[in-house]
C-alpha cells in the first residue's frame, strides 16, 4: 500500500455483507441523492447519501479502475479518507447481466428492483466502454 500523500487518499468500499476494496486512490466518484460527486485528495469533508442503483468509480494508485454497482448507503469524506458504506454492492465483473436485464424487462418488478438492475447494467456497460 502506498504511503498517504497529498496525491492520494485512503478509500474503503464496504457493503453490509463484505468489504469490497480498501486501498489508496487518486479519484473517487459516486452518485448521491444530491447528484454525481467526484472526490480528489484534499477535498473538504462531506457526507452524502448514495442512490439506489448507483455506480462508484475508484481510480487506485496502482492497478485498473474499479467500478461497482452500489445500492443505497452513505459516502463520507474526512481528512485523507473516503468511505463508501453501501447497503449492498458488487463489482461490475460480478454482475449477472442477463439476470439484471430480465429484471428490467419484468413489468412486475418493483421500482427498487428496477433501480438496482439499472445500476448493475450501467456498471457493466461503463467497464465495457472503457
Swiss-Prot record:
One Gene Ontology term, aspect cellular component: proton-transporting ATP synthase complex
Is the keyword Chloroplast in the record? Answer: no
Give the domain of life: Bacteria
UniProt xrefs under InterPro entries:
ATP_synth_F1_dsu/esu, ATP_synth_F1_dsu/esu_N, ATPsynth_dsu/esu_N
Q: Which UniProt keywords apply?
A: ATP synthesis, Cell membrane, CF(1), Hydrogen ion transport, Ion transport, Membrane, Transport
Coiled-coil positions are none
Asked if the Swiss-Prot or TrEMBL record annotates the protein with the keyword Transport, the reply is: yes
The residue range of the signal peptide is none
Q: Where in the cell is it found?
A: Cell membrane
Q: Which SUPFAM superfamilies does the UniProt entry name for this protein? A: Epsilon subunit of F1F0-ATP synthase N-terminal domain (SSF51344)
Entry membrane topology: Peripheral membrane protein
Question: A single GO molecular function, which one?
Answer: ATP binding
Taken from the record, one Pfam family name reads ATP-synt_DE_N
- State how it assembles: F-type ATPases have 2 components, CF(1) - the catalytic core - and CF(0) - the membrane proton channel. CF(1) has five subunits: alpha(3), beta(3), gamma(1), delta(1), epsilon(1). CF(0) has three main subunits: a, b and c.
Job of this protein = Produces ATP from ADP in the presence of a proton gradient across the membrane.
Report the sequence similarity comment from the record: Belongs to the ATPase epsilon chain family.
For this protein, the record's PANTHER family field holds: ATP SYNTHASE DELTA/EPSILON CHAIN, ATP SYNTHASE EPSILON CHAIN, CHLOROPLASTIC
Which HAMAP family does the record cross-reference, listed alphabetically? Answer: ATP_synth_epsil_bac
What's the protein here called? ATP synthase epsilon chain
Organism equals Nocardia farcinica (strain IFM 10152)
* Gene designation per UniProt: atpC
Amino acid at each position: 500500500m502506498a504511503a498517504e500523500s497529498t496525491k492520494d487518499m485512503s478509500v474503503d468500499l464496504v457493503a453490509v455483507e463484505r468489504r469490497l476494496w480498501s486501498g489508496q486512490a487518486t479519484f473517487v466518484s459516486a452518485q448521491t441523492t444530491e447528484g454525481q460527486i467526484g472526490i480528489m485528495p484534499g477535498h473538504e469533508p462531506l457526507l452524502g447519501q448514495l442512490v439506489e442503483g448507483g455506480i462508484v468509480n475508484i481510480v487506485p494508485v496502482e492497478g485498473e479502475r474499479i467500478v461497482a454497482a452500489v445500492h443505497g448507503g452513505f459516502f463520507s469524506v474526512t481528512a485523507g479518507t473516503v468511505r463508501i458504506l453501501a447497503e449492498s454492492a458488487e463489482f461490475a465483473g460480478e454482475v449477472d447481466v442477463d439476470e439484471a436485464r430480465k429484471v428490467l424487462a419484468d413489468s412486475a418488478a418493483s421500482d427498487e428492483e428496477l433501480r438496482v438492475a439499472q445500476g448493475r447494467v450501467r456498471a457493466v456497460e461503463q467497464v465495457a466502454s472503457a
